[in-house]
Amino acid sequence: MNKTILVTGGAGYIGSHTAFELQERGYRVVILDNLSTGHRWAIRADEFIEGDIRDTALLTQIFERIPVDAVVHFAAKSVVSESVLNPLDYYDNNVVGAQRLIQAAIFAGVTKFIFSSTAAVYGAANAEVIREDVDKSPINPYGHSKRMVELMLADAFKANQLNLSLIHI
């Protein structure tokens, strides 16, 4: 049986390309996306669920119905200027949404989680190439929200002895 990967934000640019590549490699792909910025035409999945990562009841239904082996989490608001004007929207969507997703995944026994973070967690780095060991000091609500999720994931996954990968795109 093929392993099942839940891709959040799978109707967006990076998420849709990732979903396609996962399918090409034989994984069963389930996309969860609210289509707030993604596109229905970009979806390539074995199953598409239109919904929001903040919807706890929906997440519970998904994890009860589908045997998810791993989560690849792209779903997020990501416009820096908008995050400055509406910071609480970014914390609600990016941080609260991630917390609900992480909690549901752990409760369902998912042991692998990949999180798409951002180079914005490094702030105004003074280097052309930013190394992973550079101090993280975001300078806007978008970067702060992604950094908060990184910290939350590290704590949650250490406590539960699970596998976590962070990608700074």
Question: What is each PLM-predicted segment?
Answer:
Residues M1-L166:
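N-terminal Rossmann-like NAD(P)+-binding domain of SDR-like oxidoreductases, especially those catalyzing
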